[in-house]
Amino acid sequence: MFRCKDLLLLPSMAKARPLAGKEGMNNLIRWVYKPEDMNFSKWVHGNELLIVSLPVIKSPHFNLYRLLEKAISLHMSGMLLLVGEHYISTIPDNILSYANQHDFPIFSISGDIPLIDIFEEIGHAIAYDDQRERMDSGIFANIILGNPINPDHFIRRCQEQGYDILSLQQVFILKLVCPASSQTCDCDH
């Protein structure tokens, strides 16, 4: 799954700075959301990265502290603040303190960075992680359950996902113990 700490690996986020919420860097990011005003509760489901840009900043009732409280109460993942002359110019200490208290990551990035690049890269990263997770569970579930696997299909899927199937691999063995007798279970019966 894509997490807040992974944001800093994206090329579009190369100039982003983590400001607060270091203990929340493992928060999952399911999607991104860019509100137009302070009334966005019904538009989020949790685990979104909140992108604070011009529409919400210029809204008549904009209040960064209230926005942060709302994001935390809605179980959002973190917050990306666009900063600069026409965006957020200062970030008060009470904002950073509150985010730290709630392990809520806050990042800042210049408002001059095209948002389309950030949205696109995050979307691709989330989709790739989801696809890889499904692929991993499918391949390994079939192996563990002893289901027949087409070797050519298996090799192709591993190559698509960057697995080096020619290198030494690790195998695990399960030893099943019957709870009633504390003896190893006989798998033939």
List where the protein language model places each region.
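Alpha-helical/coil-rich non-catalytic "connector" segments in signaling and regulatory proteins
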Residues: 1-171, 178, 182-189
